[in-house]
Amino acid sequence: MPVFIVFLLCMFTYTCFAEDSSESGVTEQAQAVFSELLSSLEEETKEALSEIGIDDADYTQLLSLSPKRVVDAILELITGKMSEKLKAVGFVCALLVLSAVLDGFAQPGSTMHSVFSVFTTLLIVVSLLLPVSESLVQAFSAMELSSNFLLAYIPAFAGVISMSGKPLSSAAYSSAMIGLSNLLAQCNVKVFLPVVQVFFSLNIASSVQPKYAFNSLVAFFKKAVTVLLGFSATIFTGLLAIKGSLASAGDSVAVRGVKMLVGSAVPVVGSALSDAYTSVLGSITLIQSAVGIFGIVVFALMHVPVILDLLLWYLALSFTASVSEALGQKQAATLLNGIASTVSLVNTLVIFTAFILIISTGIMLNFKN
């Protein structure tokens, strides 16, 4: 009787096969991470991503990113922002030529000569204050947007790093970047913005009232800020590289230990399980690289348009300052050089922020088990 029951069970059994769902599981995890990151972006950044061919939460689009589309988008951006600067240059040059002609009818050092110089300087301030201020506001908005995006990006990227078998590297990255995010958010409002306002005011005051020569003070101030930012960037990236290197070494030892333990402790199928573990880690490492590259692209799209806009303003203001000096308009030249110096300082702040965010992500992508 027991033999007959066993025979019946064998007759009515079905053959089953294990489903290889590793690839689909990795794809679903990647889609979930990208969807979360995309939902935290502003509409302008999403449109910029769409212009370069990244319009869906699919890491395969990052692999097919076309350099030609990126270059075309940058050229289109420069062309669109060029018209405003050319109009400003034309208007300021016309004022300078008119002021130079009127100065020809006034005696050097006379009251009329001083009136013409002050009047020209004030007209330049009025004509440039609004467009330049809008560009400066956009620069601070870009830095604020990048700080807000970090709040969603840090947990996602750190989580993927931890899933890929590098929990120590994940902890090192998240601790450093959370501190950086809070520091940038506080500095944008309490340090950077007041510094730029004071810097801008001193430049205008030194041009309207030549007896208050703040040029040397402003130049020293700018140089000090630039050196401080460069020193801070070097220290931060160096510390992150050191912490990441040590954490990566510890993670590598842990992964090898797990593989050795599984291969030796589990009989018969130990080596197969060890290979499967390695395959899973490799798949998750692919997600880590995709998320890291996506973050670098987003940070670049947030900052590159602002950097190019400020660079165009700097070139336009420097050109008009050269024209002003050639026409003998010293006060106007001082004003234009001062505004150009302010724009250059803000651009330095934006480049510093972009450099820190992009390089820190690149450092973590460089460490492999």
Where are these regions (language model features)?
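Interfacial loop-to-transmembrane junctions
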Residues: 327-347
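Alpha-helical membrane-inserting segments
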Residues: 98, 102, 201, 205, ...
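Mid-bilayer segments of alpha-helical transmembrane spans in multi-pass integral membrane proteins
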Residues: 122-131, 150-167, 187-195, 204
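Residue-level signal for the membrane-embedded core of alpha-helical transmembrane segments
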Residues: 89, 93-97, 123, 127, ...
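Loop-centered beta-sheet repeat module
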Residues: 176-238
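Small-residue-enriched core segments of transmembrane alpha-helices in multipass membrane transport
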Residues: 115-126, 146-154, 183-189, 220-234, ...
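Gly/Ser-rich, low-complexity
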Residues: 2-5, 9-95, 100-117, 130-141, ...
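Helical hairpin unit composed of two closely spaced alpha helices linked by a short loop
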Residues: 289-330
